[in-house]
């Protein structure tokens, strides 16, 4: 016993809904931190096609790793509708550091890098997010929850390949993307994205 009564937390919040929103926001913040850490480990100048591809891959990988390693926090982060849009504490940069904000920033960089055509940018974050989130749910509590780790890693690589193909600016570029053939999935995704940009002209 630590002398804390069950309803002590409510003293700091107006009601149960406000408390739940704060808990969900904190969980979403943990996910955002994991994604930001993955991006921070990627070198290269802003707008460099290879570096931009690596950053997008790092975001997706961090998302899946967090869902796998912190299933309780991951579920809590999405416990409320529209939770992805709720406030996450600022880091002093003024940037949107939410998971959705980081994905949008990575896609914007792909436009700057010449990999993703501007006319294809609007709204593309949602099908990409849906794809990665869907795999996270299938692997966490769905029919893929008991598959061997090696199989799951392969499915993750195929998911990234599918996303890369969705970013192709022309049908001819689709043939160059086979992320699963690379020994390093980050590097393979980056190579694929650079190739897509080269074939988009």
Predicted features and spans:
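Amphipathic C-terminal alpha-helical segment
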Residues: 66, 109, 129-147, 162-175
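Amphipathic alpha-helical segments used for helix-helix packing
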Residues: 68-86, 137-145
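C-terminal regulatory/oligomerization modules of transcriptional regulators
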Residues: 139, 171-201
